[in-house]
Each structure stands twice: as structure tokens, then as C-alpha cells.
């Protein structure tokens, strides 16, 4: 597998809608950086958040997930409580080619503050807004800034197309919009 460069990412985004909206340069003045980089794309976090809360004494169960585990917040700055967790989604909508696997890595700026972002791979043929998982590993409240960089996506090109894509397999997270909670089907 090869890591794909900026010119490939730009061409796929501008001509095939792989990333929408697409920022064809790195934007970093006064913000946590986002946009096209040398070998990746730094996506932005949207302004809608689901913040874990224990107000309803819910139990976190991935097979039977309860909506009352969260409070919903629409804001430009999300405060994550100490040792807590927030779900959000990317501003960008992704359409992944059949011969590409995308991995996500966190932003150094957030990691240095104890904020970890986790995203599972974007499979060949998948499309949607990416649900982002932010963990505040510190004993202090932490901020996430909407419409600024959240994580970097790295595009890996396979030697050939896969036999069955995420779309072919009717993956449960296909075409997701906004924040998508855990699904077990």
C-alpha cells in the first residue's frame, strides 16, 4: 500500500467529490490547523456534540446503547468534563474509493493537552460524515473548537480494488450524516 500525496488527494476531492467541502490548502492562522497537507487531510469538527453524562445513571452498552447517556450541545467551543468523552462529527463528507483505505491520527495540538481523538478506518467504498470520538484524559475540563482541525486522515492506496467494498456489504454506518451512535445489527 502506498500513502497518497497532496496532488492525488486534491484531484480526487475536486474531480470525484472524495471530500466535501474541500479546503485545498493548510489553514492554520489563529486556529487548530485544517485542510490539505503533504500526505493527508486535516478534517474539521462540526459544532454539534454529544457529551457523556451520568445524570440518568445509564450504563454504556454497545449492544443496547441508550441515548440518555449523553447531553446534546450545539456550540463553537465544547467543554469536555475531566476524564470524560464526547462524540462529534466531521464538517467534511467523505467518499472513499474502492481501492483506498483511510486511517485517522490525532492532532498533536490536542494530544499535548491530553485530548485523544479516535476514529476507526474508513473502508473502501464507505461514504458519510465521520463520527469522531474525543477523550479527555486529564483531571481538568478541556476544550474542543468547532470548525477547526480535529484529526488527520491518511489515504492508503491498495494495489487493486477490493472484491467487496463497504458499500457492497451494506455496512451499517454507510451514508451516515452527523453523529452516529453505536449500532449492532
From Swiss-Prot:
Protein keywords: Hydrolase, Nucleotide metabolism, Nucleotide-binding
Pfam family, one: DCD
Disulfide bond positions: none
Active site positions, chain numbering: 133
Annotated EC: 3.5.4.13
Entry's Gene Ontology BP terms: dUMP biosynthetic process; dUTP biosynthetic process
GO molecular function per UniProt: dCTP deaminase activity; nucleotide binding
Main enzyme class: hydrolase
Catalytic activity line of the entry: dCTP + H2O + H(+) = dUTP + NH4(+)
Keyword set includes Cell membrane: no
Metabolic or biological pathway, per its Swiss-Prot or TrEMBL entry: Pyrimidine metabolism; dUMP biosynthesis; dUMP from dCTP (dUTP route): step 1/2
Residues noted as binding dCTP in the record, renumbered to the chain: 107-112, 131-133, 152, 166, 176
Function: Catalyzes the deamination of dCTP to dUTP.
Subunit structure, as described in the record: Homotrimer.
Entry similarity comment: Belongs to the dCTP deaminase family.
Name of the protein in question: dCTP deaminase
Species for this entry: Wolbachia sp. subsp. Drosophila simulans (strain wRi)
The gene coding this protein: dcd
